[in-house]
A protein has these predicted regions:
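Flexible, glycine/threonine-enriched loop-and-boundary segments that flank and lead into catalytic domains
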Residues: 113-121
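C-terminal helical cap and adjacent loop that interface with cofactors, partners, or active-site loops
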Residues: 57, 64, 68-81, 85, ...
């Protein structure tokens, strides 16, 4: 709901950029925070207080944070990737079982590949952005659109409440309810989340992961209907067990 992103999407829909051939999405920044375990603290309480450190709680930062950039890629390209191959690692975290960084190649088919990079390490170069290349130019997610051959793009007027897209999305939500035209983005949210999970699984295991591995029971994939433990049921019945701190997935073995 940010005006600049809407304008970029509109330009792509109008064909100004031509077919998207590739791009890169980044969320490279510093660490968030972590909580040390308290004496006598239950596994459930520790995991909840330290949720940004456990894959079972946040999905790892490729899912919890970098998903925003991955979502832009899916939105602009108009489809989900067919497969992913990635890697990652852990260098500075002290608690939990997450990686510090991920690097994933998403293949969207039709000759389009997106390089995905995310990192949570202090003292490094930071970048949070998206870049796309089409047959007729390039653009950042937030613009500007730079074309090889000029195209006259007549942008519509976009409402931007108080200059904030985070306020505007609530305006759109409430307006949809009032007007009887509710917005349902559940499919887009689910697909972007699954795209990030696909990248995470590839990085954890070191294997090529296909979209159908996660969505098609006939694929006989070990990752179909994957469920992390502990889950909601374990927290509700009091049996939640925290994974060991600083024990992480090893590619080639996970």
């Amino acid at each position: 709901y940010a005006t600049n992103y809407r304008k970029t999407k509109f330009a792509i829909e109008q064909g100004a950029l031509g077919p998207i051939l590739g791009g890169a999405v980044y969320w490279c920044g510093g660490k968030l925070w972590h909580q040390e375990r308290r004496d006598g603290e239950s596994d459930a309480d520790y995991m909840v207080r330290n949720w940004v450190s456990f894959t079972e709680m946040s999905g790892d930062h490729i899912v919890e944070q970098h998903i925003h950039n991955i979502d832009v890629a899916n939105w602009f390209i108009g489809r989900t990737p067919k497969l992913a191959i990635g890697f990652g690692g852990r260098a500075r975290r002290k608690t939990g079982n997450q990686f510090d960084f991920f690097d994933v190649d998403f293949d969207y088919d039709e000759g389009c590949r997106i390089h995905s990079m995310c990192r949570q390490v202090n003292g490094c170069y930071n970048q949070v952005s998206e870049l796309f290349t089409g047959s007729n130019g390039t653009t950042y997610g937030s613009g500007p659109v730079k074309l090889i051959k000029a195209v006259d793009i007549k942008y519509p007027e976009y409402e931007q409440a108080t200059g904030s897209e985070m306020v505007q999305e609530h305006v759109e939500l409430l307006r949809g309810i009032i007007d009887g035209k509710p917005i349902n983005a559940a499919k887009d949210v689910a697909e972007s989340t699954l795209t990030a999970i696909m990248g995470r699984i590839s990085a954890y295991t070191g294997q090529l992961v296909r979209w159908r591995d996660l969505t098609d029971a006939a694929s006989n994939s070990p990752w179909y209907n994957l469920k992390l433990k502990p889950g909601l049921e374990e927290f509700e019945n009091g049996t939640a067990k925290a994974p060991a701190d600083d024990v992480v997935a090893i590619p080639g073995e996970a």
